């Protein structure tokens, strides 16, 4: 096999955001686009000679082709081992877990999260570091600098390899280990939660629906909920991953998951319902007749996490992004543990998790997670909710009412404005920012602004 050094010209705008480089799929499909960004990433981290990488994605359109490109480049750049999910599939939290369990040096995750998939939709690629979390700004800034001057990349002149069979194959001097994408993650969940109690919950007649939204969590949810815990067949809806997410929008909110919401709000709806997004890191929680906001969900989980075996000693602390409501702050105060507010972006929780300062983290954008991995984790949140329900033997609605009686209620609303003009949006944000210093103390209707930042 011949290592090729190909010349290339930098592409403008390859600046990673809070979750990697997100672009339209056709942008990524340009000749050399993936190669320039991946080589820039390898260069920015000091090369990958002798290293182990985890590679996988959410199965969206162009994932398969991009993974083959990355594997050839990893081999040409001297990597010793690539761990790849069977079929190229790995949920983002499962990839984080695999990096940590196998002691990998990092990973490349191919996903645009909750954004739609397809040739004319969205694509993404991000680098995670050895703790399993998203690359911090120092690394993403270094990657961006490399993209400005990249002039060549290394690859192999080889055909694609078969990622459909579990096992190890050689690609040049690099070993490619194709792993079951669900197995290690499911084992971790069984360590954290009382699976016997969950089996009893389902055996009692407790009803549930989980909408995988034709995305990557389908196989994970089917294996854990139906095959392991005994939930009835059909509990998992839209459970087969598709390159265009069934021509849907894999964002677990009341708009894009409306069929699930309508079902749980109906007279004969299930006791509990949940959904996850494209790459499996977000979640939506519902009970019969009620929707749980992500901010309230984080607070509820913080107050009740000790009921699950993995958290029976209590939580060290809790962290939330700045736009997330202060509901979890009230719980932290009552538990006498630390509470942190961070900028938006899961990577800002990493130092707190690594230092053992916090156990749970959450965002109002439907991301919740804990120190078990370094990414938010949709199915983990669902299983923790189930564990709490199994122990407390209350409905979701009754649990929320009890929580609000105990800690008070933070009224909170998120509004999404999609496909708006960028210039107009920037003007709006600039105007709001300019007014921040003067907003505190102002009254709007019946409400007075306490603080603004």
Identify the role of each PLM range.
Residues 1-76, 171-208, 228:
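An N-terminal, well-structured beta->alpha segment
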């Amino acid at each position: 096999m011949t290592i090729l050094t190909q010349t290339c010209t930098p592409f403008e705008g390859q600046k990673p955001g809070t979750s990697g480089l997100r672009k339209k799929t056709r942008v990524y499909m340009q000749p050399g686009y993936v190669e320039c960004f991946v080589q820039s990433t390898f260069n920015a981290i000091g090369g990958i000679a002798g290293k182990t990488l985890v590679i996988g994605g959410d199965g969206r359109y162009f994932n398969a082709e991009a993974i083959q490109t990355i594997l050839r480049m990893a081999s040409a750049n001297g990597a010793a081992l690539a761990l790849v999910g069977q079929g190229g599939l790995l949920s983002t939290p499962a990839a984080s877990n695999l990096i940590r369990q196998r002691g990998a040096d990092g990973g490349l995750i191919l996903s645009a999260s909750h954004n739609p998939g397809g040739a004319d939709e969205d694509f993404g690629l991000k680098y995670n570091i050895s703790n399993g979390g998203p690359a911090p700004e120092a690394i993403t800034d270094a990657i961006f600098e490399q993209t400005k001057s990249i002039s060549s990349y290394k690859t192999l002149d080889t055909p694609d390899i078969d990622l459909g069979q579990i096992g190890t194959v050689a690609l040049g001097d690099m070993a490619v280990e194709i792993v079951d994408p669900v197995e290690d993650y499911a084992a971790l969940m069984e360590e954290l939660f009382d699976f016997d109690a969950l089996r009893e919950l389902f055996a009692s007649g407790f009803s549930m629906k989980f909408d995988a939204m034709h995305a990557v969590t389908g196989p994970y949810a089917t294996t854990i909920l139906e095959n392991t815990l005994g939930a009835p067949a059909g509990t998992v809806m839209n459970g087969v991953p598709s390159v265009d997410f069934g021509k849907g929008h894999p964002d677990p909110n009341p708009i894009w998951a409306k069929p699930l919401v309508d079902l749980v709000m109906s007279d004969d709806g299930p006791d509990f319902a949940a959904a996850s997004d494209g790459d499996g890191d977000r979640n939506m929680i519902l009970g019969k007749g009620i929707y749980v906001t992500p901010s309230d969900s984080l607070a509820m989980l913080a107050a009740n996490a000790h009921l699950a075996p993995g958290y029976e000693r209590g939580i060290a602390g809790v962290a939330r992004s700045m736009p997330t409501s202060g509901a979890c702050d009230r719980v932290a105060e009552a538990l006498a543990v630390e509470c942190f507010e961070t900028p938006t972006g899961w990577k800002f929780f990493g130092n707190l998790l690594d230092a053992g300062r916090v156990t749970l983290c959450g965002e109002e954008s439907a991301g919740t997670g804990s120190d078990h991995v370094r990414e938010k984790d949709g199915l983990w949140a669902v299983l923790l909710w189930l564990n709490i329900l199994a122990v407390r033997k209350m409905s979701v609605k009754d649990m929320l009412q009890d929580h609000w009686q105990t800690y008070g209620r933070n009224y909170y609303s998120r509004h999404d404005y999609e496909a708006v003009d960028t210039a107009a949006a920037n003007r709006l944000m600039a105007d709001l920012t300019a007014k921040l210093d003067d907003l505190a103390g102002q009254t709007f209707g019946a409400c007075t602004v306490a603080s603004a930042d």
